[in-house]
Swiss-Prot record:
Pfam family, one: YciZ
Source organism (scientific name): Escherichia fergusonii (strain ATCC 35469 / DSM 13698 / CCUG 18766 / IAM 14443 / JCM 21226 / LMG 7866 / NBRC 102419 / NCTC 12128 / CDC 0568-73)
Family listed: Belongs to the UPF0509 family.
Protein name: UPF0509 protein YciZ
Amino acid sequence: MFELDAQRLAERIDTVLDILVAGDTHSAIHNLEILKAELLSKVKDNAQSGTPKSPWEI
């Protein structure tokens, strides 16, 4: 499984929350879409890396 930097993720979420508090919902949604795409890309890259799966992941 890929390494997830929880601190970095929390900072990104905090930024989105700050944007929402400021009232710019369009930018907040855009930032969430970017974050989602980055996370899905990491998952896809991990799946293609050929790392053997644990029995419960098959």
